[in-house]
Amino acid sequence: MKSISVLALALAVSTSTASAQPVRWTKYTIAQTGTSMDFPSSIFTEEAGRPDVYGQRFRTADGRADITIQAAPNVENDSPAAFLAKKHPPSRIQYKRVTPRFFAVSSYKDDKVWYNRCNFSGRLIHCVLIDYPAEEEHAWDNIVTRMSLSLSGR
């Protein structure tokens, strides 16, 4: 019984980054493109470089999760379906939704969940790309949903 209590305590102490503290939200905006999104600034505290296009990468302080918020020109005026097809996503995608205005895809790679959503507006593609530990998937559900649904651009 004592070992069960120790295990429960260890699990409680190692709570996920996503649920350990109340989440502080801010609005992140890419000034050059108008891309914006609700951003959990209390989770993604470290800048982690820039993508090849407009935007920024961030990671958690412990490096277990990362996010890229970016915007890129839609040079070939692709629809979400055409753009996604050109990226050759893996065949074993767990979640896929494609509409005339956006796509969202998610699956597992090694011990991580990856989630990508891209909204199409005019000549720009506005995206959020998130990777986080698969063992914390349920703790991240509401956070990922809020970020995804708040993604917008002009």
Give the ranges of each region predicted by the language model:
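Conserved polar/disulfide-associated segments of primarily extracytoplasmic proteins
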Residues: P22, T45-N142
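Positively charged n-region of N-terminal signal peptides that target proteins for export
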Residues: M1-I4
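Generic detector of short, well-ordered, non-transmembrane alpha-helical segments enriched
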Residues: S14-S16, F39, M147
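Short, low-complexity, Pro/Ser/Thr/Gly-rich segments in the mature regions of secreted, periplasmic
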Residues: W140-G153
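N-terminal "mature-domain start" segment
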Residues: Q21-D52, L151
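Hydrophobic h-region of N-terminal signal peptides that target proteins for export
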Residues: V6-S19
